[in-house]
A protein has these predicted regions:
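Short polar/acidic secondary-structure junctions
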Residues: 59, 72-74, 218
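Active-site HxH/HxHxD metal-binding segment of metal-dependent hydrolases
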Residues: 1-59, 145
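Short flexible/disordered coil segments
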Residues: 22-38, 50-53, 133, 193-213
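Conserved hydrophobic "DFG−1" position in protein kinase catalytic cores
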Residues: 62, 82-84, 215, 227
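C-terminal regulatory/interaction regions
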Residues: 164-234
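Short coil/loop residues immediately preceding or within conserved phosphate-binding loops
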Residues: 57, 64-67
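Short acidic/glycine-enriched loop/turn segments that link adjacent beta-strands
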Residues: 54, 76-77, 219-222
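Metallo-beta-lactamase
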Residues: 32-52, 66-162
Length: 234
């Protein structure tokens, strides 16, 4: 986290990164202040000698039972879930939560990536490979069953958000800050604005990667998104 925090602060100090998002000027300093704070639980160090890297498909014997690694992406890189086929249990972490959706964001360090595409693919993988009667143990809220329906619901919810953006963009060319208010039409705290902006950018990157929209920078460097593509861009 400390290394990631330093990279984030470095990126934040590159003003054009925030200018492209069309953030208000005072928000720049507030973001740097948030990531510069040292009193967060996540700042605790993990030493290399207690870290063991896990990969998709690896199997571990834990307490006499075999657990298989199932990786997902989009919320965080290589998010590992643990699946026990014998007992029908999936420790899903943030990859499958019963009533809320994990944040899927573009971060300043990787602002051209397609995390939403990765997230939808990960939801499809869990839907198609884990039995529906599996007991899911999430990192938030209560255990649940019905993983396949829940994964499809998450997929459908993101496609509904994408359609909201498409409809809004057909009416006006907009910036990420404006589109955030289309997706999140309520008052947000400073950190929620960061998360909501990252999620809005993730949805726009999904459309950009599929050539449904394109990006234009104005004289200040703020990004605007015309929709649909003009003939010169096809």
């Amino acid at each position: 986290w400390n290394l990631l925090k330093k990279e984030i602060i470095s990126k934040l100090k590159t003003v054009e990164n925030l200018t492209e998002l069309n953030f208000p000027e005072d928000f720049h300093d507030r973001l740097i202040s948030f990531f510069s704070a040292d009193e967060k639980p996540a700042n605790k160090r993990v030493t290399k000698d207690i870290v063991e890297f896990m990969c998709e498909g690896d199997v571990f014997d834990i307490g006499g039972s075999l657990w298989r690694i199932v990786c997902g992406n989009g919320h965080s890189p290589e998010h590992c879930c643990l699946y026990n086929e014998e007992h029908g249990v999936l420790i899903s972490g943030d990859q499958a939560i019963p009533r809320i959706s994990s944040n899927v964001s573009v971060y300043l360090a990787n602002r051209h990536d397609d995390p939403l595409g990765d997230w939808i693919s990960s939801c499809e993988k869990l839907r198609d490979t884990i039995p529906n009667d599996t007991l899911v143990l999430p990192s938030h809220q209560e255990p649940f069953k019905g993983l396949q329906e829940r994964m499809q619901q998450l997929i459908d919810d993101h496609h509904a958000q994408l359609n909201r953006l498409r409809i809004s963009l057909k009416e006006n060319v907009q910036t990420i800050d404006q589109l955030r208010k289309v997706m999140f039409d309520r008052k947000l705290s400073s950190i929620d604005v960061v998360l909501a902006t990252g999620e809005t950018q993730a949805h726009m990157n999904y459309l950009l990667h599929r050539k449904e929209v394109h990006k234009e920078l104005d004289s200040r460097g703020a990004a605007h998104y015309p929709y649909p593509l003009s003939s010169k861009d096809t």
